[in-house]
UniProtKB/Swiss-Prot annotation:
It is an enzyme of class 6 (ligase). Its EC number is 6.1.1.6. The gene is lysS. It catalyses: tRNA(Lys) + L-lysine + ATP = L-lysyl-tRNA(Lys) + AMP + diphosphate. This is Lysine--tRNA ligase. GO terms for cellular component: cytoplasm. A motif ('KMSKS' region) lies at residues 290-294. It comes from the Bacteria. Signal peptide: none annotated.
Length: 525
């Protein structure tokens, strides 16, 4: 048993919970293949999106947790369903008219609309691999097309023929009457057109390894099920793959949950053992709709990394995988600041179980870097950017250096990156939407009180003392709810309904600069 076992289990961190499930499923035995196989899947009909990254990031968290608890070797494969027939043309690709002429063709048989690779499927696979490589994932890439054509699934495909009636008994009750009449687990690849055919199978022969169907002209066509001449419908394909590859762990989105029983049962029918499974909730866009590769209605990995470090994206993936979460640009600043908080807590924590419970342990697979931001958050930088409208990060560093003389781009490279990210985020998402509140007579009294307070303190006054003074002014102003007081101040001074702790902000921005800001709002008609 691993030396860290007790603390890992005590932490109740979900990657360790999943890792223990895998160990329990092995009953203390090393698999015949001598390693534990983790599998992620990718449907390359559209460009890879952040959900694709998320599945792989989460999978690696479980894989690394398993390696902490056991000395059994592991392997991660990323499986691309690139032999699927094209059912719909994505809205976010070039040359859609050209692609539309290849409906029902395997994705690896469609010309690349981007003009870069040998096929549409190859282009999408390359995109997936490039960003998995970029983030250091260690995986083996499996192409459905290659697996079928190379004969990797041949033994299982013959077994599907042998178990044909049993599989049909399992599948048919899940369909409507009209689909029952035409369904078969096999989809022949038409020898003439190359299309993936969804046609009734008239005859199947396990000994010969063939199926027979009628083509469009009404002629009988007999094809082998092996060697890439047929592929399985996606539900039987899922279970067959588990059995063929001996997958030990798989995670999938909630859209697969209703069919998970079928995948597992088909795997058993074919003589395999279903893997331990985790069903994660899907990401939603800002309208509460499921994000989609073909719609392109999500944040891409590149989008996120334009405005924030990769660790913040990994944190978003780690948090509550079984709970649906909205994924849009507003979540980025929150995740950056939560990452900073978790990082600081991790390095202050001496209890190992609590360290294991900290998301950053799993984000960095136990090798957590120590970052220094001198108490400056991403949200604070966004608000600083909002008032000084800098052309580049050197302007922000002018304020940061006065706030904390020890802070420089060299002593805090993380903070330096955040300054750059904050300017980009402000310019793209905040600047155009600022809406200032014109101060009422009541507000002007408050602003004058703030001015008087600021003129009575020095640059050495602590942020907490400034915060308390601001708070006291709000209490004196007679607000029933001080949230309304701060909201009014944010709208008057920053043009937004939410903002930072004003004591910290004023300390960072500077007393004199804040007085000028307040005077501008107080005396401008």
């Amino acid at each position: 048993m691993s030396e860290i076992w007790e603390d890992a289990i005590k932490s109740n961190a979900w990657p360790f919970v999943e890792a223990k499930k895998i160990l329990d499923s092995l009953n203390g035995k090393v698999p015949e293949k001598n390693y534990v196989l983790f599998e992620t899947g990718y449907g390359p009909s559209g460009l890879p999106h952040i959900g694709t990254f998320g599945e792989n990031a989460r999978m690696v968290m479980v894989q690394k947790a398993f390696e902490q608890l056991s000395d059994i070797s592991t392997k991660l494969i990323c499986f691309s369903d690139d032999m699927d027939g094209l059912r719909k043309v994505p809205s976010n690709i070039p040359n859609p008219e050209m692609v539309a002429g290849y409906m029902d063709m395997p994705l690896t048989s469609i010309p690349d609309p981007f003009g870069e690779c040998e096929s549409y499927g190859h282009y999408m696979n390359a995109k997936l691999r490039s960003f998995l490589d970029k983030f250091g994932f260690e995986y083996e890439f499996y192409s459905s097309t290659n697996c079928y054509k190379a004969g990797m699934f041949d033994e299982m495909l013959i077994r599907v023929l042998e178990k044909y009636d049993e599989i049909m008994e399992l599948m048919l009750p899940t369909f409507r009457e009209e689909r029952k009449a035409t369904y078969s687990p096999f989809m022949p690849i038409c020898p003439k057109t190359g299309k993936v055919l969804q046609v009734p199978i008239e005859k199947w022969d396990a000994k010969a390894g063939t199926v027979r169907y009628k083509d469009e002209a009404g002629n009988y066509v007999e094809v082998p099920v092996t060697g890439g001449h047929c592929k399985l419908q996606w539900k039987p394909d899922f279970g067959m793959r588990w059995a063929a590859l001996k997958v030990d762990y798989e995670m999938y989105g909630k859209d697969h949950l209703a069919n998970a029983r079928l995948y597992s049962e088909i795997c058993r029918i074919l003589g395999g053992k279903p893997p331990v499974q985790l069903c994660y909730e899907l990401f939603l866009d800002e309208n509460g709709e499921k994000i989609s590769k073909s719609k392109g209605n999500s944040i891409s990995v590149d989008d996120w990394l334009k405005y924030a470090p990769v660790e913040s994206m990994a944190l978003f993936m780690y948090q509550n995988p079984t709970r649906a979460k909205r994924l849009f640009f507003d979540v980025i600043p929150k995740n950056v600041d939560e990452y900073i908080t978790f990082n600081q807590k991790y390095h202050l924590e001496e209890d190992r179980a609590k360290r294991f419970a900290n998301p950053v342990y799993h984000i960095h697979h136990g090798n957590v870097p120590k970052i220094e931001t001198f108490g400056i958050t991403y949200a604070l930088l966004l608000n600083l950017t909002s008032v000084c409208n800098p052309s580049d990060k050197s302007v922000l560093w002018g304020f940061i250096s006065k706030y904390e003389p020890k802070a420089t781009p060299k002593t805090s490279p993380y903070l330096d990156h955040l300054a750059e990210f904050a300017i980009r985020y402000y310019n793209d998402f905040i600047k155009a939407y600022k809406s200032y509140l014109a101060p009422s007579e009541k507000h002007k009294v408050i602003l004058q009180d703030i001015l008087d307070m600021l003129s009575s303190i020095s640059d050495q006054t602590e942020a907490e003392a400034i915060q308390k003074a601001i708070y006291d002014i709000g209490m004196k102003a007679g607000y029933e709810n001080l949230r309304d007081y701060f909201k009014d101040l944010y709208q008057i001074l920053l043009g937004q309904s939410e903002g930072p702790r004003l004591g910290t902000f004023i300390k960072l921005y500077g007393i004199k600069e804040t007085m000028k800001l307040v005077e501008g709002k107080l005396y401008t008609r």
